[in-house]
């Protein structure tokens, strides 16, 4: 497998058509088809279902796309950095993140960032959204990735992504439930949720209030890892962002079910001080974090 094959695969995955992908790559269609067939042979996996309406990616293709697209973005970013006269970026980045995002994507994000910017020092703090807002306002953090609060902010705000919250149960011990859940009719299920000082609980409560739905958790815990482990080992369910549990869902340890009614979506935003612009290193780290969140939750990196 070489970089050219990966580029061809990504183009075909995104365009869904040999004709469109070949045009995008500026190559002839037989050359593209030959490289994809060669790639499938090397991997011993069928990557696309051929049909009259185009190329439909298989599960193997979706997994490959999730794994390789961030790598190609890093290569493009590194090439861009090296082509500039000011390629060596130095300094220090101080970033805050809500723990639900930090625990899920930060290790991979920092590894990618360090490979691109080895001379930049990084400090990351986690906490509740309100705490991180205070730290940005006081100048202790360059920026923070938080849950969007209900009130207005005196900081610069950049929307990063919208993420669904899902009902999570143990794959081995959890109750047998339909793939889509109506919380208004959910009965006989014990719930563990974050406490009310947690921004995730605020998102959940706001959605329930708007839909006139009432649920009462039996347990309230702020440590997300503890919530996840508790759910793994019991018949208790929880409601959390998909990014928090997706890996364990992929490993068939947990099950995540869509909440059809009321839909619960949290809005992730970036906040920074209007008098302290974000530098290029901080911006690069934030972009990588956004890509990792999309990769984990949907397989679609940030644009």
Where are these regions (language model features)?
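Alpha-helical linker/hinge and terminal dimerization helices associated
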Residues: 10, 42-43, 63-86, 296
């Amino acid at each position: 497998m070489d970089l050219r094959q990966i580029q061809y695969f990504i183009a075909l995955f995104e365009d869904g058509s040999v004709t469109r992908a070949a045009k995008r790559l500026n190559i002839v269609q037989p050359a593209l088809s030959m490289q994809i067939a060669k790639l499938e042979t090397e991997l011993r996996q069928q990557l696309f279902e051929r049909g009259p309406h185009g190329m439909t990616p298989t599960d193997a293709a979706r997994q490959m796309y999730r794994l390789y697209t961030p790598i190609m973005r890093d290569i493009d970013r590194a090439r861009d950095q090296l082509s500039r006269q000011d390629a060596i970026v130095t300094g220090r980045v101080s970033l805050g993140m809500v723990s639900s995002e930090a625990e899920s994507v930060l290790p991979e994000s920092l590894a990618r960032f360090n490979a691109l910017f080895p001379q930049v020092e990084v400090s990351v703090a986690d906490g509740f959204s309100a705490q991180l807002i205070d730290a940005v306002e006081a100048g202790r953090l360059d920026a923070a990735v938080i849950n969007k609060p209900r009130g207005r902010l005196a900081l610069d705000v950049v929307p990063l992504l919208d993420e669904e919250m899902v009902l999570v149960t143990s794959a081995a011990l959890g109750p047998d439930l339909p793939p889509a859940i109506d919380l208004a009719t959910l009965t006989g299920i014990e719930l563990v949720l974050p406490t009310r000082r947690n921004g995730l609980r605020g998102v959940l409560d706001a959605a329930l209030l708007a839909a006139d739905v009432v649920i009462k958790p039996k347990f309230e815990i702020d440590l997300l890892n503890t919530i996840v482990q508790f759910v793994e080992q019991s018949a208790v369910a929880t409601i959390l962002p998909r990014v928090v549990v997706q890996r364990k869902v992929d490993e068939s340890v947990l099950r995540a079910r869509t909440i059809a009614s009321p839909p619960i979506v949290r809005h992730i935003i970036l906040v920074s001080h209007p008098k302290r612009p974000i530098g290029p290193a901080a911006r690069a780290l934030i972009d990588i974090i956004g890509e990792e969140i999309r990769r984990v939750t949907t397989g679609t990196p940030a644009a």
